[in-house]
Structures are given as structure tokens and as C-alpha cells.
């Protein structure tokens, strides 16, 4: 049986460990220390590292993990990932028979130019592109690129479990409620998220069904989001890219 465990790192990162009580994949290891401790405690044998993008809080632990376990490193072909042995582009497939797992690689640029996601068997590891009720900042791409990447992820089945890399959910929900105040799914989600955090339980994974109902960055064609974005910029916005760009910029400065 497959389990996905969140190893916490830094202030709010999750390093995901996909395992079957014997073998393990390590996803976006920004810090080796907590990973080494948990892997040792569980007596697991790592078989690969999977990276979504080059930012240090997703890759900083790779050299130590490779030194310890001598395992392959998968990552985006056009980004500098330390120790990368298997450069990937969208459309590639990965097979890990030890875990009976297969992943498809999706190109999802925007947060970084080469950002990729890993999708298979209802698991989506999407790094810093799609967050629970939010999305990543646009550092290397355009609003149009980022929206297209989010729409690509939103086209996956509703039951897909979303494993993003940061615990940003409550802040994202509070921003979403400003944009979409009468959305009953958001009101319910806020309560659920607050309760989980009170108990120190991760709010992830989310699901694409929940994201499509609550995430304003996936709902740029909805009247409530269009209205809020238009009011914020002081003019009517009539296309999803303009709405997306307006609310992404708003979120950058939202307190």
C-alpha cells in the first residue's frame, strides 16, 4: 500500500515521501536533515529524488541525500538541479516498479521557466505552481503561461490529490474569501483548515474537486472573481488572463 508522508522543513515547506513501508521516493528535498531522520526512523530504502523546479528550498538537500544513498535525481531538463541524472520534459513517463507507480511529466511553466509536475494514479506533485486555494508567484514566466499551466492541472480528474510544497492554505483561503465572499465551499473550507491547523495537522493534500470549487486562480471566468478583480483595478476586465494577472498582483501585496 502506498503512503505519502509530509516531512516538514524550514518555515512551511513539505518534502513529500512516497513509500510502501519498504521503498521510497523523495520529492523536492530542500533540506536533507529531516528527510534522513525520518527515512532512518522508518527503515526505508530511497530509490529516487524527484524535483519540480530549481529553487533552493526544493533542491538544497539533494547533494547530502545523493551522497548518503547514491540514487538518481529527476528534474526539469532546462533548469539547474544539483546532481540531476534524468532531465525531464513534458510528456515523459517514469516507472517505479518497486512502488508499482507510474508518473507522467507535465510542463507547467510560470513560477519558474522549466517547472514540471508529476502526475499518476491520482497523485499530483505540483511544487509551487498550484497551491491549496492559491498559486505560486510568477518569477520567470508570464501571467498567460501561469494561467495555462493551472488550466492544464485543472483538466486532470476531480479526484486527483494535490500535493503542493508549502503550507499556505489558510492565508490563501482568507484572500479567496475577499474575492469570493459568498462561496459556501470557501466558508466551509476556512473552518476545516483552521481546525486542522489548530491540531497541527497538514491541510494537504487537497483535491482538484475542492480546488475547482474554491481556488480563485482556477475560477477566473466566474462572475464573483471577475467582479472583485475589476473593482480592484478600477476597470472592467473581460478575459481570464487579465483577471488572473490582476488577482495574482493583488495577492502579492495582500496582508
Swiss-Prot record:
It holds the Pfam family HAGH_C. CDD domains: hydroxyacylglutathione_hydrolase_MBL-fold. Binds 2 Zn(2+) ions per subunit. Belongs to the metallo-beta-lactamase superfamily. Glyoxalase II family. Zn(2+) 1 binds at residues 53, 55, 111, 128. The gene is gloB. Zn(2+) 2 binds at residues 57-58, 128, 166. GO terms for biological process: methylglyoxal catabolic process to D-lactate via S-lactoyl-glutathione. This is Hydroxyacylglutathione hydrolase. Its EC number is 3.1.2.6. The lineage of its organism: Bacteria, Pseudomonadati, Pseudomonadota, Betaproteobacteria, Nitrosomonadales. Monomer. Its cofactor is Zn(2+). Thiolesterase that catalyzes the hydrolysis of S-D-lactoyl-glutathione to form glutathione and D-lactic acid. Keywords: Hydrolase, Metal-binding, Zinc. GO terms for molecular function: hydroxyacylglutathione hydrolase activity; metal ion binding. Gene3D superfamilies: Ribonuclease Z/Hydroxyacylglutathione hydrolase-like (3.60.15.10). It comes from Nitrosomonas eutropha (strain DSM 101675 / C91 / Nm57). It catalyses: an S-(2-hydroxyacyl)glutathione + H2O = a 2-hydroxy carboxylate + glutathione + H(+). Pathway: Secondary metabolite metabolism; methylglyoxal degradation; (R)-lactate from methylglyoxal: step 2/2. SUPFAM superfamilies: Metallo-hydrolase/oxidoreductase (SSF56281).
Amino acid at each position: 500500500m502506498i503512503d505519502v508522508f509530509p516531512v516538514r522543513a524550514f518555515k512551511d515547506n513539505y518534502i513529500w515521501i512516497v513509500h510502501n513501508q519498504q521503498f521510497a521516493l523523495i520529492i523536492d528535498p530542500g533540506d536533507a536533515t529531516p528527510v534522513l531522520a525520518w527515512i532512518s526512523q522508518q527503515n526505508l530504502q530511497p530509490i529516487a529524488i524527484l524535483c519540480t523546479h530549481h529553487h533552493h528550498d526544493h533542491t538544497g538537500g539533494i547533494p547530502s541525500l545523493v551522497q548518503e544513498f547514491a540514487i538518481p535525481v529527476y528534474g526539469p531538463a532546462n533548469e539547474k538541479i544539483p546532481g540531476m541524472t534524468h532531465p525531464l520534459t513534458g510528456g515523459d513517463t517514469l516507472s517505479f516498479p518497486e512502488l508499482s507507480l507510474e508518473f507522467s511529466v507535465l510542463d507547467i511553466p510560470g513560477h519558474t521557466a522549466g517547472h514540471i509536475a508529476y502526475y499518476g494514479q491520482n497523485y499530483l506533485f505540483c511544487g509551487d505552481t498550484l497551491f491549496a486555494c492559491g498559486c505560486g508567484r510568477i518569477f520567470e514566466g508570464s501571467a498567460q503561461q501561469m494561467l495555462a499551466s493551472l488550466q492544464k492541472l485543472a483538466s486532470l480528474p476531480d479526484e486527483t490529490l494535490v500535493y503542493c510544497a508549502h503550507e499556505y492554505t489558510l492565508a490563501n483561503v482568507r484572500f479567496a474569501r475577499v474575492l469570493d465572499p459568498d462561496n459556501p465551499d470557501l466558508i466551509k473550507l476556512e473552518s476545516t483548515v483552521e481546525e486542522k491547523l489548530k491540531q497541527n495537522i497538514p491541510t494537504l493534500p487537497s483535491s482538484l474537486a475542492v480546488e475547482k470549487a474554491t481556488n480563485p486562480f482556477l475560477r477566473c471566468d466566474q462572475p464573483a472573481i471577475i467582479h472583485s478583480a475589476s473593482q480592484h483595478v478600477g476597470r472592467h476586465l473581460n478575459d481570464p488572463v487579465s483577471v488572473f494577472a490582476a488577482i495574482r498582483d493583488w495577492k502579492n501585496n495582500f496582508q
